[in-house]
Amino acid sequence: MNFPEQTPSKMPVHRYSSFIPVELTDRTWPDKKMTAAPKWSSVDLRDGNQALIDPMDTPRKLAMFKLLVAMGYKEIEVGFPSASQTDFDFVRKIIDEGLIPDDVIIQVLTQAREPLIRRTFEAVKGSKQAIIHLYNSTSTLPRRVVFGLDKEGIKKIATDAAQLCLDLVSTVPETKISFEYSPESYTG
């Protein structure tokens, strides 16, 4: 797979000085120094199941999207399309109307459940580049009470969902897909 590189941002990263390194001679990674700005990513447009009492409608999301682009963000999480029709419609709008600049990568969030993953791939179809951000609950309480699974069972949910994502890449051949995974944990 060919994963897209992020276009450098015009954000004023020169204003921030580098950290003072801590020397740990028994390790190699702490001695590495960042010489380039990290990827800047916005998650301001995701309402999904974390929506406020009054979630953003499409015109508000579009105004915010345009502002984030103008500010120089190159990765923008534009929604949780399988969690809300508003988010799905917004993602489709910015794709169908060609509102995503060539150097901006959209990101969408999805839970590790087959119908939600499939709906998410429907949402990003036709975009030039997209990041599918997959997550599943790994906390002790949901693992036991909601799923009735042990750690291996929860791990299988994640790996099966990741495999499904890989399989669905072929359904969006015009889109360069990247992946992100997050374990969701509230109670340990």
Report the location of each language-model feature.
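N-terminal amphipathic alpha-helix/helix-capping segment at the start of soluble metabolic enzymes
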Residues: 2-47
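Helix-rich catalytic cores of soluble enzyme domains
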Residues: 140-188
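Catalytic domains of carbohydrate-active enzymes, especially glycoside hydrolases
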Residues: 61-81
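Glycine-rich, proline-tolerant flexible connector loops at the mouths of alpha/beta enzymes
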Residues: 74-100, 104, 108-111, 136-146, ...
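Hydrophobic or amphipathic alpha-helical targeting/insertion segments
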Residues: 114-140, 152-153
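N-terminal small/glycine-rich loop or linker at the start of catalytic domains
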Residues: 29-55, 133-147, 172-180
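Acidic (Asp/Glu)-rich catalytic clusters
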Residues: 92-101, 119-130, 163-174
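Active-site-adjacent beta->alpha loops and helix N-cap segments on the catalytic face
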Residues: 27, 34, 58, 82-95, ...
